[in-house]
A protein has these predicted regions:
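C-terminal cap/substrate-recognition subdomain and adjoining C-terminal extension
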Residues: 8-9, 61-63, 72-169
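Alpha-helical substrate-recognition element adjacent to the catalytic core
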Residues: 1-101
Length: 169
């Protein structure tokens, strides 16, 4: 099925932080099975259980899915790691890109993430400070906290509410 160009350009964007959101510790969270050797030596991060399903489902529902992280992992590293889980992001903003495109030469230190600068409608994060700044800087955020077996359903529902609200405007 081919989509019209205007439909693709108007797709709502959802972004995820990496650390403590998609990458979690198996000591505190349920995780996807580790990658097989030798990839488990290259990519030591463990994915929160359900991450590939959630990202692929969001894309099937018509959302663009991005990574927006303050980490300085390269875009290439992120792409290759997630390829092993059959996940392809629509966009990636890492710490390097954020500094170059958002912070630039601004004398005032801006927050580590400003999702609305990339037309991201919903950002998923664990950091309380980023969530508190959302109202001040005009972006929507869903704070993902501890282990939550229903996290996928909650994020899909939250994204649907925002998409509905945006279509009313």
């Amino acid at each position: 099925m081919q989509r019209k160009v205007s439909e693709i350009n108007n797709r709502m964007r959802v972004s995820f932080d990496l650390d403590e959101v998609l990458f979690v510790s198996p000591k505190t969270h349920k995780t996807e099975p580790p990658l097989h050797f030798p990839f488990n030596r290259i990519y030591k991060e463990r994915l929160r259980l359900g991450t590939p399903d959630l990202i692929n489902e969001l894309q099937e529902l018509g959302y663009e899915v991005w990574v927006y992280t303050s980490s300085f992992r390269s875009e290439e590293y992120i792409v290759r790691l997630f390829r092993h889980y059959h996940v392809k992001f629509d966009g990636i903003v890492n710490g390097t890109r954020h500094l170059k495109e958002v912070q630039r030469n601004n004398a005032t230190t801006l927050p580590q993430k400003l999702p609305n600068r990339y037309h991201i409608s919903l950002h998923i994060d664990d950091e309380e400070i980023g969530c508190k700044l959302a109202g001040q800087y005009g972006y929507n955020v869903y704070q993902l906290e501890a282990q939550d077996d229903d996290w996928k359903e909650k994020i899909i529902a939250h994204a649907a509410k925002i998409r509905e609200r945006e279509h009313k405007d």
